[in-house]
Amino acid sequence: GCGDHFFLASLQKAMADLGIAPYETAVISGIGCSSRLPYYMKTYAMQTIHGRAAAIATGAKVANPYLTIWQVSGDGDGLAIGGNHFIHCLRRNVDINIILLNNRIYGLTKGQYSPTSPRGFVSKSSPYGTVEDPFRPAELAFGARGNFFGRAVATDNQGVMELMKAGQRHKGTSVCE
């Protein structure tokens, strides 16, 4: 599964702990398992087209620099069709928080391999196993000149919440995987 409910609970708690007002916040998602998450937040929210969440989040921050921006994408949405927007957002160091839900598969399409699926991974779209090596999100982020990357396990609510709080305190783009 995608673990969205764990991230939702952690994000809500992190925002409350940080004292971030919902009316000063936007949660922006792409398409996939993460796409419905903004609807459960009492903030400004937008579900964008596939792969464009980082571009929309960047635009929202540029248009209103006082907004706290949380951009939520899965590994397929954020690193495949949205990969170019991901790396340029990091390169520009826009002050947004990217939550990357990496389950190493396109979960919503029920089994298509993603950019983070391991080599040899057998799925409906790769019945003989994938032939590519996977992206390593941390290496991709730092290679694009990102300067905040953290990783937590979805079921560790406290760890995820602390990671999100650290990402929000960081000035510039943060990636919380």
Feature locations, PLM:
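Generic secondary-structure signature for well-ordered alpha-helical cores
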Residues: D4-F7, K13-I20, V62-P65, R91-V94, ...
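Conserved active-site and cofactor/substrate-binding residues in soluble primary-metabolism enzymes
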Residues: G3-S10, P22, G51, A55, ...
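Short catalytic-loop micro-motif centered on adjacent basic/acidic residues
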Residues: Q71-S73, F148-V153, V175
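Conserved thiamine diphosphate
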Residues: Y66, S114-H170
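Active-site diphosphate/adenylate-binding microenvironment
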Residues: G1-I49
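Thiamine diphosphate
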Residues: S29-G107, G159-E162
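Glycine-rich, charge-decorated loop segments at or immediately adjacent to ligand/cofactor-binding or catalytic sites
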Residues: G107-Y113
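Generic beta-sheet signal
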Residues: T25-V27, L67-I69, G172-C176
